[in-house]
A protein has these predicted regions:
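Short, charge-rich, low-complexity alpha-helical interaction segments
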Residues: 1-48, 53-83
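Extended acidic/polar alpha-helical scaffold segments
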Residues: 56-59, 63, 67-70, 75-216
Length: 216
């Protein structure tokens, strides 16, 4: 049988545990000003080098999201030297953001093609990049690439996915948690509840819904 939400109230959670979870989320997402206010209000100890690290990561993400992926790559190498050399997937994705910017801003197709040939094509020696390369190169065939079958590559969602991966990689490179504590808690809760639902499926219980669980 499912767990009665009222039973949650029987589990005591210390304030400092909640504070640590909130702080983890704020630091992970580079909310510098909010971190300063939160630390001041709660009396928590600020993590070492926390503010400087957030400021540097925030600059990198800003450049990547605003269309200056080459600057983001440069700053990433300064902050986490060797990261992109060892993480080819991430390096490819960042380079692809610059290519997309050339396409989106209607730069001369020759410039976009030359960039692709010099920076992206070498990845084609590895099979897993071939299909991605074909998708990116196909954008050049359309006068309005946003109407092409690969339009999703031009979206802010794609940029955000790359930035999220970059954030996790930079944090891991610095031996820091690559996921915010709240994200890990939600992942764990979802997996556990899905397993419970499967075990009790014979009782006709509905599949676990995270959205419904958070409303309970």
């Amino acid at each position: 049988m499912d767990v009665d939400p009222r039973s949650y109230e029987q589990v005591a959670i210390k304030d400092n545990e909640i504070h640590n979870i909130v702080l983890s989320y704020l630091v992970h997402n580079c909310y510098k000003e909010t971190v300063e206010s939160f630390v001041a209000c709660t009396g928590m100890k600020q993590p070492a080098d926390c503010l400087e690290d957030m400021e540097k990561r925030k600059r990198i993400f800003h450049y990547a999201l605003e269309g200056n992926a080459l600057k983001a790559i440069e700053l990433t190498e300064e902050l986490a030297h060797g990261l992109l050399e060892n993480n080819k997937d991430l390096h490819f994705n960042l380079l692809s953001l610059h290519f997309i910017e050339l396409v989106c801003t209607r730069k001369c197709s020759t410039e976009a093609l030359e960039f692709a040939q010099s920076k992206l094509t070498p990845f084609g020696k590895v099979q897993k990049y071939v299909e991605k390369l074909e998708d990116f190169m196909a954008l050049l065939a359309y006068e309005e690439p946003e109407k092409s079958p690969m339009f999703h590559l031009l979206s802010l969602d794609y940029r955000q996915q790359v930035v999220d991966s970059l954030n996790r990689a930079i944090l891991a490179h610095a031996n820091r948690p690559s996921y915010a504590a709240i994200e890990r808690l939600i992942q764990q809760t979802t997996v556990v509840r899905q397993c419970l639902s499967q075990d009790h499926n014979k009782d006709g219980l509905p599949p676990f819904s995270l959205k419904d669980f958070l409303k309970s």
